[in-house]
Regions:
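N-terminal secretory targeting modules
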Residues: 1-70, 74-81, 93, 245-268
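Soluble non-cytosolic domains of exported or imported proteins
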Residues: 61, 65, 81-86, 146-153, ...
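Conserved SGNH/GDSL esterase-like catalytic core that processes O-acyl groups on lipids
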Residues: 66-68, 74-154
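Residue-level recognition of beta-strand->loop/alpha-helix junctions
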Residues: 103, 175, 207-209
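Active-site segments of SGNH/GDSL-like serine hydrolases
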Residues: 138-142, 161-192
Length: 268
């Protein structure tokens, strides 16, 4: 046996083992198989813009739908010459159906109203025997002063309750419309929150803020700034009903119709 040759062979073997160990350490350091991957909750909660969204299905309604319109004073018909001239009532003719109007003045997801509690309690009190084809949940600017804390949780709970009560109904969220211009920061925050939450569920969201329903050019035609205390006027309610009907038609790809045939609407 040649002792020099044996030492050389042992040295080469040691170098080979060392190289393998170094490579393994590098691979494991990069791969880190023991570290858990990011959870879906963490990814979704990383930021509004990064949240996972679900594409809504086209809105499909029967020829003569029953529509539950649920919201605040705008849904109630405040500042119209008669509450029944409010947008939620006028919508019935525009969709060739029937509307069930449930509006409580001053109410929101967090804020109790003048005539009833906040949205969550009101949803719990709805008649489970109703069979709406479509539910429109409107608003609300009434939550502006309540702040962001707990807002998304209240919205989620209310929407969960509505969907559980009427599982066969399609649900469309109608965001807050500005009662004054420029649009306030709190109203804009509510609009963003509702849009993100609706997108995460695959629900349609209609944003009067983003779509410019109320502008400096038509503001005084739509909003009664005197006796109406910055609520839609009678003409304003008609205008809002037409904008909503057109938006709903777009969600289903149907032709857009205008209310009242030759009736004029406030300038846009």
């Amino acid at each position: 046996m040649n002792p020099v040759f044996d030492r050389r062979r042992l040295l080469l073997a040691g170098l080979a083992v060392g190289t393998v160990l170094v490579l393994a350490a590098v691979v494991l350091g990069v791969w880190k198989p023991w570290s858990p991957g990011p959870s879906s909750a963490a990814v979704a909660g990383a930021g509004h813009d990064d949240a996972v969204t679900i594409a809504p299905a086209p809105l499909t309604l029967p020829e003569h739908p029953t529509v539950l319109v649920f919201g605040d004073s705008w849904t109630y018909g405040s500042a119209a010459s008669e509450p029944t001239l409010g947008y939620a009532y006028l919508l019935a003719d525009l969709v060739h159906g029937t509307t069930i109007v449930n509006g409580v003045r001053g109410s929101g997801y967090l804020k109790p109203g003048i005539d009833g509690p906040a949205f969550g309690e009101r949803i719990a009190a709805l008649d489970p025997a109703l069979t709406p084809d479509l539910i429109i949940i409107q608003g609300s600017i009434n939550d502006r002063a309540q702040g962001a804390a707990g807002y998304r949780e209240a919205v989620t709970a209310a929407w969960d309750a509505m969907a559980a009560k009427y599982p066969e109904a399609q649900i469309v969220i109608l965001g807050p419309a500005p009662h004054e211009l420029p649009v306030g920061a709190a109203t804009a925050r509510i609009d963003r929150d509702l849009a993100a939450l609706a997108a995460a569920r695959g629900w349609w969201y209609i944003s009067p803020v983003a779509d410019g329903w109320i502008t400096p050019q038509n503001y005084r035609d739509v909003i009664d700034v005197d006796l109406g205390r910055k609520h839609p006027s009678t003409a304003g309610h008609r205008y809002l009903a037409e904008r909503l009907a057109a938006a709903l038609a777009d969600l289903g790809g149907a032709p857009v119709t205008v209310a009242g045939g030759s009736e004029t609407t406030p300038e846009q």
